[in-house]
Curated annotation (Swiss-Prot):
This is Oligoribonuclease. It comes from the Bacteria. The keyword Nuclease applies. It is an enzyme of class 3 (hydrolase). Belongs to the oligoribonuclease family. Coiled coil: none annotated. SUPFAM superfamilies: Ribonuclease H-like. 3'-to-5' exoribonuclease specific for small oligoribonucleotides. GO terms for cellular component: cytoplasm.
Length: 206
């Protein structure tokens, strides 16, 4: 029922309440009341992003009627990636995926501890609250949204902002890894401690 399972060869990740759960979905559109989830993946990292463990990746079955309602961009993007064919062939429901993902995550972090991590993650959370409500409650109510740093960097440090180029694969697992890489980039180039600031710049007074 899973397309991709966690690899036994990956570095061991110790269960810890500071571990971070990264998540991404692909949907048929942007409206959680009328559109549906068609792919979901999770990755768990330690708090410093040094160790990552991939969870299952699920294509969620949806009817041909639902898929036909997608706009041209979604049909083209998800058709080109092969996701539409995977969705048609899948027998996994939202409930199936949610139960298996929650069981996987419980190995690494307790319910209610990890924020939901990703890019524009509030959109994923809206869909999860609509179609996977029990799974949504597994997460802390806070989000760790990399797009917040993206928007600040674009306004405050545009040269640094332009230094990270997204591949825009629009598959759930690839997008998660890209979000983690993007946060690492901002940590190195944008979130610079005062002691490491360029010469001539001083930290503001407390």
């Amino acid at each position: 029922m899973t397309d991709t399972a966690a690899s036994a060869s990956q570095p061991a990740l110790v269960r810890n309440e500071l571990n971070l759960v990264w998540l991404d979905m692909e949907m048929t559109g942007l409206d959680p009341d009328n559109d549906r989830i068609i792919e979901i993946a999770v990755v768990v990292t330690n708090s410093t992003l040094d160790i990552a463990v991939e969870g299952p990746v699920f294509a969620i079955h949806q009817s041909d009627e639902t898929l036909a309602k997608m706009d041209d961009w979604n049909k083209s993007t998800h058709g080109r990636s092969g996701l539409i064919d995977r969705v048609r062939a899948s027998t996994v429901t939202e409930a199936d995926a949610a139960a298996q993902l929650q069981a996987f995550l419980a190995q690494y972090v307790s319910p209610g501890k990890s924020p939901m991590c990703g890019n524009s993650i509030c959109q994923d959370r809206r869909f999860m609250a609509r179609w996977m409500p029990e799974f949504e409650r597994f997460f802390h109510y806070r989000n760790l949204d990399v797009s917040t740093l993206k928007e600040l960097c674009r306004r405050w440090q545009p040269a640094i902002y332009k230094g990270f180029q997204k591949r825009a694969m629009h598959t759930a697992l690839a997008d998660i890894h890209e979000s983690i890489d993007e946060l690492k980039y901002y940590r190195q180039h944008f979130l610079i401690p005062a002691a490491s600031a360029p010469a001539g710049e001083s930290a503001p007074a407390a």
